[in-house]
A protein has these predicted regions:
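Phosphate-binding loop of NTP-binding sites
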Residues: 64, 87, 101, 112-205
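Nucleotide-activated sugar donor-binding and catalytic core shared by glycosyltransferases
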Residues: 1-36, 157
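N-terminal leader/targeting and accessory segments in enzymes
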Residues: 36-137, 196
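Residue-level detector of family-conserved "landmark" positions at structurally sensitive sites
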Residues: 8-9, 22, 75, 96, ...
């Protein structure tokens, strides 16, 4: 993907020659601040709609949001096992895209794969409803707990699953949002209201 390559190249050039004591974490935080992302306070109940809710990433976000106590709805173009699982959690799912589903929402979010021209996004903006990216929504969730982000090019899901399992075994009762189901738990996302939140952070976040 040439566009992504250009973005990465520009980011690498902007980093320049860093002082030897500058850490990778400091560079990441610096880059994040420059992106000007928006957040929303999720400590109080919100009404949220998720566009493209049927994928593993957004279905995990939906699961965490509804378990936090928010009123969640979603849309996708086809039914799936994940859609059924979300409906069993009490999430209202619309198959197909309908601009009217965003009425009354506090904010709308969605998969990075969904075009900005999507009719539900357009309707939300017409109504001055905030539209947050998945990364912005995830960052807003992270503000509600002490968050442990697992990043990297390989092994994020495995490492996140191991960390979650270890913390559960230690009685820490963590919340978690992982890119795949933890085999021992048969799910990849949960909100426990505990102190810790384990989150798998991919390149889109």
């Amino acid at each position: 993907d040439q566009t992504k390559l250009r973005v990465l190249a520009n980011a690498a050039r902007s980093a320049g020659k860093q002082h030897r004591e500058t850490t990778l974490a400091e560079l990441i935080f610096s880059a994040a601040k420059q992106r000007g992302r928006q957040h929303i306070d999720l400590r109080e109940p919100k009404r949220v709609h998720i566009v493209g809710v049927g994928g593993p990433g957004m279905s995990a976000v939906a699961t965490v949001l509804v378990e936090m106590g928010h009123q969640v709805s979603g849309s996708d173009i086809r039914r799936s096992e994940l859609i059924t699982r979300l409906e069993n959690l009490g999430i209202t799912i619309n198959i197909g895209h309908n601009p009217e589903v965003v009425l009354g929402c506090d904010f709308v979010t969605g998969s990075p794969a969904i075009a900005e021209s999507n009719i539900e996004y357009r309707k939300a903006r017409d109504l001055s409803i905030r539209v947050l990216s998945r990364a912005e929504t995830l960052a807003s969730i992270c503000r509600c707990a002490t968050s442990v982000g697992v990043a990297g090019t390989h092994g994020k899901t495995t490492t996140s699953s191991m960390l979650t399992t270890i913390l559960l075994g230690a009685g820490k009762n963590p919340s978690y949002l992982i890119g795949g189901d933890v085999i021992s738990l048969n799910r990849g996302a949960s909100w426990s209201n505990g102190e810790l939140f384990v989150v798998e952070a991919d390149e889109s976040d």
